[in-house]
Amino acid sequence: MNIEDVVLKYALANAVKYGGRADVKAVMAKIMAEVPDLRPRAREVRQLVEAVVAKVNSMQPEEQLRLLRERWPEALEERRVEQRRPGIESLPELPNVRGGVVVRFAPNPDFVLHLGSARPAILNYAYRMRYGGRFILRFEDTDPRTKRPLVSDEVNAYEAIREDLRWLGVRWDEEHIQSRRMEIYYDHARMLLSMGAAYVDLCRPEEWRRLRNAGRACPHRGQSPEEALELWDRMLRGDFGEGEAVVRIKTDLSHPDPSVRDWVAFRVIDTSKTPHPLTGDRYVVWPTYNFAVSIDDHLMGVTHVLRAQEHSVNTVKQSYVFKHFGWEQPVTIHFGRLRIEGASLSKSKLKALRVRYDDVSLPTLAGLRSRGILPEAIWELILTVGIKPSDTTVALSNLFALNRKRVEPAANRYMFVTEPVKLVFESDRELVAKIPLHPSYRERGERVYKLGPGRVEVYVSSRDVRPGAVVRLMELANVEVLEVGGGAARGRLHSLELEAARRVGAPIVQWVADPVEVRVVKPVAVGKKVEEVGLGERALEAVEEGAYLQFFRYGFVKKVGRLDFVYVHD
């Protein structure tokens, strides 16, 4: 393969993967990694890459994909080996599977993904893994006014969604961005107008609603294709303002659901006031969700659509586009809404909280990742719920239980004391505490503390001591509390054996000697968290960042800084 072909191959592969736009740096990195012999010629190669990338980016995404399939089909198969996940085989069979399947996950990038968004992503990808085929990531971003894509200094929703999917272990075979496919939608609008299957409506919105609700035709419905195309061209030129002209698909004016009757396919959006973050004010006529989806599902070869029950009426609306063009509509399966008990998954409500999208108190995927929830736990939750048509409500505690069984074996145990007070007592002997890192994995080792003889000072929680009570200092000794006050407590050595503590009903409490100050961020509600400051073992300084631990009688935590932790769950 000559150098020109090498560059073209990787430029096409990069463009197909990322929505029709190849990146010079990414293509260069791939070439230098795959063909190291070219490194001495890096400057020459870069000039060629820049030229080829410009040429590739001028192509329509369909042309890029076609050329890549024709010349280098193996590039489409260069994917990491996918691990079969438990639970996939328990999903019901899909109807009308002919070989593999082509499925899609189509988020609106007006916000990041949350736990509810993970459901269609995982279910569609699970069937892609089960049957083989293609999984398409498609950004549906054709409403720059009411559902404006989120691109700001804080977050780029396009990239955040990609990052969330990678973290989930969802890998896409190709990517498309609808706002970069406008000419494709325009071409198909022109076809429908030429066929008499659509028309340009100039009625005032209130007049249209009156006619629609009465099941009567708009006076513009009978316009000739020539008249419709002339009005269409005027729309594209910007002759109409918002609400003055729309393109409608001809449906059934007697349909029992008024929203299905001649629904809007295109409308005018003044992008000089609400520019699109990717295309600016280049376009003023924008396709609606149902039109763009219909065209894309056909052109991308989608065979099966798995989506929420709330889209059932959209399936009906889209059927008219398929009928007008004589296309076969994908098999569509609707599943019920996933609700999280005590946690809203509404995008608008999550946005209104005014906290970072990756805050540990949010049920966004980024927030759950920051908190320490593992993607495998989310997979198990979603596959357990499955594709039931009825709504499902689960508690976050269900997700936490699935996560707990995964982090528990790895989480070494440490002592952490909140609201600490110093407990002082005398001992006539040396006290030795041997605390295993994990009670079920003794081979990991233990920490040994030697205190006394003489004055012994340890820190315990103020909630664990009251005058007259006996407490069991974990793995150390039993101490009778004599007095408490002024941020300190005084006691006397009662006994050493665990059995003696049991006889007097002494609670086992954690304690810290030679402490360090520890901070734990703890989510308490959606959008709310508290910081708890306490004392922990000095051994925590040596724990690697990112490690999961269990603080005795407190819960599982994840280390995120030198002595900073995030509370994961109990």
Swiss-Prot record:
NCBIfam families: gltX_arch, PRK04156.1. It catalyses: tRNA(Glu) + L-glutamate + ATP = L-glutamyl-tRNA(Glu) + AMP + diphosphate. Keywords: Aminoacyl-tRNA synthetase, ATP-binding, Cytoplasm, Ligase, Nucleotide-binding, Protein biosynthesis. The keyword ATP-binding applies. Its main location: cytoplasm. This is Glutamate--tRNA ligase. Its EC number is 6.1.1.17.
